[in-house]
Swiss-Prot record:
Binding site for Mg(2+): 487, 493
Catalyses which reaction(s): RNA(n+1) + phosphate = RNA(n) + a ribonucleoside 5'-diphosphate
Chief location of this protein within or outside the cell: cytoplasm
Basic and acidic residues bias spans: 702-771
NCBIfam families to which the protein is assigned, alphabetical: polynuc_phos (TIGR03591), PRK11824.1 (NF008805)
This protein's encoding gene: pnp
Protein name: Polyribonucleotide nucleotidyltransferase
Length: 771
């Protein structure tokens, strides 16, 4: 029934298996990839014809993590997988980016690639496996895919590269890098690093490329057994003659338009040239399809003119040299009520970045295959349509916004202080108000300044730059700080961010078959110079982290208590901690190790909660004076609560120096008093005194009461004249015979049974009376 084809290789200490022919057989291509006990299925389907009017390549990639893969049931009301999570969106983009350039120009058939995680062992991450499965499924499907590609994750720990590291190794190490590559060239790089040098980053990419080659060989071996017949693709018509005609008609107009430095003016001039070409097509009697094809040739002509000017004349669209950075203006404390803010402008790209500080309960909860986790640093990137002067959708973030936000997050995450150093939840927002190239790197620069403005003690400021590439044969030009048009018309989008000490993130997308090591090294070196320049401009706005938090930001104070005291602070059913929060107004969080975080925007509230907790966990000291409150009156004295959670007895004789007939005449419940600890017995019961403390000032008074004289007992005589000694056998007492023993019967009436819970109305009973 099944015609199963399978290929296995040893890869990174595990067995990688690619299998087809058993599952999803109606798809054009379907592959199950297995690494360890992690299993991913990717199925590819393609439309057999192109939709009318289609003028772009409609490739859609969906990555989904099934909760059943990790033996979990989804949370929430519906108990099933819902819309894509942030991770699923990011992995979908990770798969899409390296495979999209490998389809031929002019191929507009719709393609779906759906990758589903079916099993997860908690050790081998499924994202890399999904990339491999997608590449293999496309390769055997018969669609015109110029792959295959391989994918690999690389870590860097103790000076050594690690292929497909575990989560623990990534956390301990200095690098998390993902590479996708064909056998001959790197297609995509995505990374986060702890300020690593260009040499280490380049070495990691080359190490990953070697690992990708092994995967590519395995996919080719599978395709030799299971590939379907390749699709026949109609050859594109020779458009040389039409291009020459257009060059004569609008070539000068296009060249003049690309010399305009203002984006809006340039766009208007280009639209006029395109309209002129379209009128010519219609005048020649071309049908709508032919007109559309002609417009595509106009775009090719635009690319040719711009690329030639850069390569031959060294002239960029806005007149800059290849290494020149656009003018930069940075301003901090841009918004008066934000905890931290910055306005960062680079040429025609601008962002308003804000930093908001919160407490632990503001952390983002993430529910994934590994279970629940919490993230205390968030970065949200927003790209409204007005930023490019267009009308469009405004609302929930799309895939692009999620991806750009995560790139900026990776750039800034390595320089954050630890949660012990800075126990705040941090949310950065980057609202792009103008865009003409590299808005994600503007978000990095603006976000770094906003955190510094908020008083977040980051290690060092971070700057970012976007690099471009124009490659024709052996000739190439590397461009620093690319414009949007240079991105669209170029061959590479290479973003690098880092501090003065090293790289924190690197992202590269290649739109051609790949680049050489020489070009990669040159791009890294040129990016380093650009980052240093941008960092210098940022330092003019704010050279160091502000020493004080914003007056509008919450304050957090931490205190460590003995783990044995946690139950005392929380109380039965959380009664004590709820009372602290309700009374003081401060938020109180306590973890299993006894670390307490007290937060509020009011310092007095924090101090009140701190004193309360300190009183609960502190041990009373004999001879020390404390503030207390009367909580219960009894005939023989008063019980006083002090140090927040301790009770002691002030005996009636210790209330005043003079005799007190009735306690209620001089004290009342709820009355604030000052007491001195006289004694703590071995069972922890505390004896207090009020009479030796000035109730107004709390100062200790001299004890003027004379010490009690010991009672004289005199000579008690000889035992012999005191009557018979009482022992176990003699029941007489003082010569009198005792009456009969009273058993359960007799005339005493019914015996009173005592409730296990004690009297119903005892009032406040101190802890030491509950023993």
């Amino acid at each position: 029934m099944f015609d199963v084809k399978k290929v296995s290789i040893e890869w990174g200490g595990e067995t990688l298996t690619l299998e087809t022919g058993k599952v999803a057989r109606q798809a054009d291509g379907a592959v199950i990839a297995t690494l360890g006990e992690t299993v991913v299925l990717c199925a590819v389907t393609a439309a057999k014809s192109v939709k009318d009017g289609q003028d772009f390549f409609p490739l859609t990639v969906h990555y989904q993590e099934k909760y059943s893969a990790a033996g979990r049931i989804p949370g929430g009301f519906f108990k099933r997988e819902r819309g894509a999570t942030e991770k699923e969106t990011l992995v979908s983009r990770l798969i899409d980016r390296p495979i999209r350039p490998l389809f031929p120009e002019g191929f507009y058939n719709e393609i779906n690639a759906i990758a589903q995680v079916l099993s997860y062992d908690g050790h081998n991450e499924p994202d890399i496996l999904a990339m491999v499965a997608a590449s293999a499924a496309l390769t055997i499907s018969g669609v015109p895919f110029m792959g295959p590609i391989g994918a690999a994750r690389v870590g860097y720990l103790n000076g050594e590269y690690i292929l497909n590291p575990t989560d623990e190794q990534v956390a301990e190490g200095d690098l998390d890098l993902v590479v996708a590559a064909t056998h001959d060239a790197v297609m995509m790089v995505e990374s986060e690093a702890n300020e690593l040098s260009e040499e280490v980053m380049l070495g990691a990419v080359l190490f990953a490329h070697d690992a990708c080659k092994e995967v590519v060989k395995a996919i080719i071996k599978l395709a030799e057994q299971a590939a379907k017949e390749p699709w026949e693709i109609a050859s594109s018509d020779d458009d040389a003659a039409l291009k020459d005609k257009l060059r004569k008609l609008i070539g000068k107009d296009i060249a003049a338009a690309y010399k305009l430095t203002d984006k809006s003016a340039r766009s208007n001039a280009l639209n006029e040239a395109r309209a002129k070409a379209k009128e010519s097509f219609i005048a020649d009697g071309l049908d709508p399809q032919a007109v559309m094809a002609g417009i595509k040739i106009v775009k090719k002509l635009e690319a040719e003119i711009v690329r030639t000017a850069i390569l031959k004349e060294g002239k960029r669209i806005d007149g800059r040299t290849t290494t020149q950075i656009r003018p930069i203006v940075a301003e901090t404390h841009f918004l008066p009520r934000a905890h931290g803010s910055a306005l960062f402008t680079r040429g025609e790209t601008q962002t308003i970045a804000t930093c908001t500080l919160g407490t632990k309960d503001a952390e983002q909860m993430i529910d994934g295959l590994n279970g629940l986790s919490y993230q205390h640093f968030m970065l949200h990137y927003n790209f409204p349509p007005y930023s490019v002067g267009e009308v469009g959708r405004f609302g929930a973030p799309g895939r692009r916004e999620v991806g750009h936000g995560k790139l900026a997050w990776r750039a800034l995450h390595p320089v954050l202080p630890s949660k012990d150093e800075f126990p705040y939840t941090i949310r950065l927002t980057s609202d792009i108000t103008e865009s003409n190239g590299s808005s994600s790197m503007a978000s990095v620069c603006g976000g770094s300044l906003a955190m510094m403005d908020a008083g977040v003690p980051i290690k060092r400021p971070v700057s970012g730059i976007a690099m471009g590439l124009i490659l024709e044969g052996k000739d190439y030009a590397i461009l620093s700080d690319i414009l949007g048009d240079e991105d669209h018309l170029g061959d590479m989008d290479f973003k690098v961010a880092g501090t003065s000490e090293g790289i924190t993130t690197m992202q590269m997308d290649i739109k051609i078959a790949g680049i050489t090591r020489e070009i990669f090294e040159a791009a890294l070196a040129q990016a380093k110079e650009g980052r240093a320049h941008i960092l210098g401009e940022m330092n003019k706005a704010l050279g160091e982290v502000r020493t004080e938090l914003s007056a509008h930001a919450p304050r957090i104070e931490t205190m460590q208590i003995d783990k044995a005291k946690i139950r005392d602070v929380i109380g039965t059913g959380g009664k004590v901690i709820r009372e602290i929060v309700a009374t003081t107004g401060a938020k109180v969080d306590i973890d299993d190790e006894g670390l307490i975080k007290i937060s509020s925007s009011d310092l007095d509230q924090i101090e009140a909660a701190r004193k309360w907790i300190a009183g609960i966990v502190e041990e009373a000291e004999v001879g020390k004076i404390y503030d207390g409150k009367v909580v219960n009156l009894v005939d023989f004295g008063a019980f006083v609560n002090f140090m927040g959670g301790k009770d002691g007895l002030v005996h009636v004789s210790e209330i005043r120096n003079e005799r007190v007939e009735k306690v209620a005449d001089v004290l009342s419940e709820g009355q604030d008093v000052k007491v001195k600890v006289l004694e703590i017995d071995p069972r922890g019961k505390v004896r207090l005194s009020m009479r030796v403390v000035d109730q107004e000032t709390g100062a200790e008074l001299e004890d003027t009461r004379p010490a009690r004289e010991p009672r004289e007992r005199g000579d008690r005589g000889d035992r012999g004249d005191r009557g018979p000694r009482r022992d176990g056998g003699d029941r007489n007492r003082g010569g009198r015979e005792r009456g009969p023993r009273r058993d359960g019967g007799g005339d005493r009436g019914p015996r009173r049974e005592r409730s296990e819970d004690g009297p119903e109305d005892q009032g406040h009973v101190p802890d030491f009376l509950k023993d």
